Design a protein with these regions (language model features):
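Hydrophobic beta-strand core positions in alpha/beta domains
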Residues: 44-46, 76-78, 122-123
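Thiol/disulfide oxidoreductase modules built on the thioredoxin-like
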Residues: 90-98, 104-151
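Structural microenvironment flanking redox-active thiols in thiol-disulfide oxidoreductases
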Residues: 56-95, 105-112
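N-terminal signal peptide c-region/cleavage motif recognized by signal peptidases
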Residues: 4-6
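Structural signature of beta-strand start/N-cap positions in the alpha/beta core
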Residues: 41-43, 73-75, 100
Length: 156
């Protein structure tokens, strides 16, 4: 069972590794997204759930980051962990997001990526390698965070 992160100062932890496993999930509209489809871009993969208060709290900053860096070079993929589509749709009607929300029914991807606490995020560089991980809530629109992610963008 997953736990929600307690209130502590989460930070970007630098790593240099391949993603834990392939990502291939459908979004709430039924469109399939594969991590490989985004090769050449920076991808922020965020695992979350509507019942997770820190997850809900960080969503606006993820949306601001998507809007700030949201060129063809950057995308947020929010992986919802095993919740009914109706619950996710209700959440999205109250908090529209400018990035895809993917459905991990049965938590198969969540387990494959070894996510045990929500929210959990992975920043994947254009070459397909994980460059940062975060466990817990983070203000993704904080200038220092934006700067670190922007440095990964192609042409930077």
């Amino acid at each position: 069972m997953l736990a929600g992160a307690t209130a502590h100062a989460a930070e970007l932890k630098a790593v240099d590794a391949p993603p834990p496993s392939a990502l291939e999930l459908s979004d709430i509209s039924g469109r399939v997204h594969r991590l490989s489809d985004y090769r050449g871009r920076v991808v922020l993969v965020n695992f979350w759930a509507t019942w997770c208060e820190p997850c809900r709290e960080e969503m606006p900053s993820l949306d601001r980051l998507q809007k700030q860096l949201g060129t063809r070079s950057f995308v947020v993929l929010a992986v919802n962990v095993d919740e009914p589509e109706a619950r996710i749709a209700k959440f999205l009607s109250a908090m529209p997001l400018d990035f895809p929300v993917l459905l991990d029914a049965g938590s198969k991807l969540t387990r494959a990526w070894k996510v045990r606490v929500l929210p959990a995020s992975f920043v994947i560089s254009p070459d397909g390698r994980a460059r940062y991980t975060v466990t817990g809530e983070l203000d993704w629109s904080a200038p220092a965070v934006v700067e670190r992610i922007a440095k990964l963008l192609p042409g930077q």
